[in-house]
Amino acid sequence: MIMELFKIFSMRIFREFFCVFGWVQPLRPQKDITFLTLCDGTGYLQVVLSGRVVKSTVELVGMLQVVPEGETAPGGHEIIVDHWQLETNPSIQADLRHLVLHGEVASAVLRLRAALLAAFRQTFVKHSTIEVTPPCLVQAMVKGGATLFKLDYYGQLAFLTQSSQLYLETCLPILGDVFCVQESFRAENNHTQRHLSEYTHLEAELGFINFDDVMIEAVICESVDILLADPSSAALIKQLKPKLQPPARPFLPLSYVDATTWLNEHGIKYIMVEHTVGNDIAKAAEQMTDIIGKLVFLYRFPAELKAFYMKRMPQKEGSNVVFTASCDLLIPNVGEIVGGSMRISDYDELITTYKQEGMDPSIYYWYTDQRRYGTCEHGGYGLGVEMAQTSYALKGFMFFVECDDIIYVLRLSGLGFLH
C-alpha cells in the first residue's frame, strides 16, 4: 500500500486524504508532535501524530505530502495524520513470544533470507543445475535411525526426511546436475543454539566429477557476490552485519589428519587427552577455525565418522583406517555450514557397505539399482540455510511451533532471542 501511495503522489494528485494501515516502527517524540515510521511490508512511510503506539498496529487517515526542504524521511514523503485508530497494543508481546517477528530486525532477517535463497538459485542456474522437489515423507534413512521422526503412513512406517540426497542421485541420469531447497528434519533433542529439529536444506548432486570438482566454494562465493551487488540485499547486510566481507578465495584446505595434529599442537584436547585418528573432532575443529580466522575445508574423514554412501579412498599399506572422499566447510564463529562427498558408484562396494553398517539392502533397492543401470562418478553436498545466514547476518531464525500449549520461537543465533 505504501509503495502504491508513492506512485499515486508521483502523478501529482495533491490534497487528497488517504487511509493507510501498518505497523509502527521506532518513533521520535518531539515537544508537540511525534514522528513515527509506518511499515506495511511494501515500504516505509513517515507519519506525524501524537500518542504512544510503538510496534502497535494502527489505522491512519491523513494527507500525504513531500517532506519539507532540508528534512529526510523514508521515500521522501510523510503523511500528516488527521485521524488515527489503534488496532492492537504492543504490551501483549511480553506474554506472546510468537509476536517477536514484529519489528525491523525480524523483517530484515526474513528479507535477507529470501534474497539469500534467490542468490543460491541464481548461482545454480548459472552453472546449469536444475531444481527438483524430492519428497519429505520417506522410508529410507540417510544419516542414522536415532535421529528420525517416525510416523504412520497408511499402516506403514515412514519418516520425515533427514536429507534429499538419495533422491537427487536418482535424477542425475535424466537431468544432469540437480539441486533442491527442501526442509529436513532431525530428531535430536538438543537445546542448543546450533540445533534445529527442522531446517531448510540446500542440497546439490553433480555427475561426472571428481573430488576437486565439488563446487561448494563457487556456490558460496558467487552467492555472496550476488547479495552484495544488489542494493536491497546489500543494505540489509549493512544493517545486520556492517563489517561483512566477501569470503577470501581459495578456502583453506586441511585434511582430517593434519587437523588432528594441529589440535594437539595447540593444546585442544579430546576429553582431557590428545586427539588420535578416529576421534570425532567436530567441536574441536570449530575452535580451530575460530583461532585460524578464515574459512576452512576439512577433508578426508575416517569412514567410521561418516555416512554409508560416501566413497572410500584407497587404503594405505599398513594403515587400519579407511578414509572417505568427504569434506566439511567451517566458518569462524559459526561452525560447519556445508558437508559434502563423492558417492559410492560401484555396486559391489555399496553392497559391502550395507553389510558393514548392518543395513537392510532391500529397503534401498531403488538406490542400489542406480549403480546397476548407468551410473557415473558423482558427488554432492548439503548446506544448512539457517547456519549460512548467521554468517551473513549474525541472526537467523525459524518460525514458531506450538507444542503442549507452549509456544517456542526456534532460533539459530549466538545473540539470544530477537527483541
Predicted regions and their residues:
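Class II aminoacyl-tRNA synthetase catalytic cores and aaRS-like
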Residues: 1-419
